[in-house]
Amino acid sequence: MNPRRLSLVGLLGLIVVGLTTPAFAQTTPNAKIDRAVRAGLLSGARTQSVIITVKPGYRETIRQALQQHGDRIKAEHPLIESLTVDLHSEDVAELAKQPWVNAIAADAIVSAKSDLSNLITQPSQTLATTLRPTLGLPPLPTSSTMTGATGVSVAVLDSGIAPNDDFTGRITGFYDFTQGGIPTNPYDDYGHGTHVAGLIGSSGKLSNYQYVGIAPDVHLIGFKVLDGTGQGKTSDVIKAIEYIIANKAKLNVQIVNLSLGHPIYAPAKDDPLVQAVEKATAAGLIVVASAGNYGQVQKGSGSGYTGITSPGNAPSAITVGAAVTNDTVTRDDDVVASYSSRGPTWFDAYAKPDVVAPGQALTSDTNASSYLYKLLKGSQVSKNGQQFLTLSGSSMATAVTTGVVALLVQAHNQSGYHRQLPLTGNLVKAMLQFSAIRLPGVDRLTQGSGEVNAAGGIVLASAINTSVADGKWWLAN
């Protein structure tokens, strides 16, 4: 037997000596190892970057054992009792045998969820004339009650936010988790996050109010977790979520936008990114996540199922697919985009997405020096002497939905019924689903409960009294 492996087994044995070990339900060791890690083992990789989730109370001891064994601890995640480790592949199986190890998952690459393949020849669409009206909103906000104002803040976990006059005074924080989570001046070298932020809350000033976001007064907090190529690490996204939860009151954040993800490699209970999202929801945050862009089995071959990505498979997340409005206000001609991921989810067979929202060919803010802007020359839009970009995907639909959620939170805050209990993620999801408009001839695993209806959701959010006693009606009138 390999002496290195013996060393790790011996060190792990100290855990049994040093700790009172309760009886654990036994799980087949191989079932603890996710698909990506197993693929790495089959490929012969010497080491793998993994996220090890352990039973409560064992994280510190396992960290010490791994360090003594020469494995590099890259991060700890107290939120989900996990460690990110550069682990020798030959030790994966031994770790999985330990009863205090719950799961071993890859520190998977996450990426932005825009469908670049659908954009090269895609003509630009006009945001102001159809996007807001198809949601039941006026083309331009007519009062302060539908702007996302009154202290509503959204955490945008993406490639960054490039500051411009559409966001003046409303980017209230920026943290670069591709560089360890340092606070810094806002920037976006990839361009995806700026586009997402614009859909959520652009004032429209730069475009002479042609491209106004859904909640144009909302505050934005940027968390850069994707690099200049639009990719990042799961562990960095988890660290950003941990920071948001720990500083929720200081940041005054209510909503988290996750227009990113990776393929599902494990059941939700063993997926560290999903578990971080579940903790965020439990902490009172409203998490909106993209369904993914894997709706086609192969490009041009029709729509397929089970394409939902992580963390869109998080039970508590509001998971959003992309709809095509055909640039009309009416819903009569709306369809779900062919690329929009369908449910059910792998492993757990959860019914996702929860809703769909406009996500096809939406024009929004950009950074002219960003990777995406330079790449997608056919998607560049010039308006009022300024540059914008047209993108499609569940990322865009997620941003639109996040803007709608900001309006719901504002409507509830202004109703006077919020003083005891704010809106929760599950309640907001229920309101979006109840008020959504079903698309005819489309199944539930494709459209969820239907296409988001902002006007209907605002009415519900304004009427719900969350301070009433258990067993009483929440609707005020």
Regions found by a protein language model. Name each.
Residues 38-39, 253-257, 357, 384-388, ...:
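C-terminal subdomain of the subtilisin-like protease fold in secreted/lumenal serine endopeptidases
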Residues 180-182, 261, 332, 336-338, ...:
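Flexible glycine/proline-enriched surface loops and loop-helix/loop-strand junctions
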Residues 58, 203, 207, 225-316, ...:
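Substrate-binding/access-modulating region of protease and related hydrolase catalytic domains
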Residues 42, 67, 71, 96-100, ...:
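Sec-exported extracytoplasmic/periplasmic mature domains
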Residues 2-145, 153:
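Autoinhibitory N-terminal propeptides
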Residues 31, 35, 60, 64, ...:
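Solvent-exposed, polar/charged alpha-helical surfaces in well-ordered, non-transmembrane soluble domains
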Residues 26, 72, 141-175, 182-235, ...:
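Subtilisin-like serine protease catalytic core
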Residues 127-140, 374-385, 423:
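Surface-exposed intrinsically disordered loops and tails
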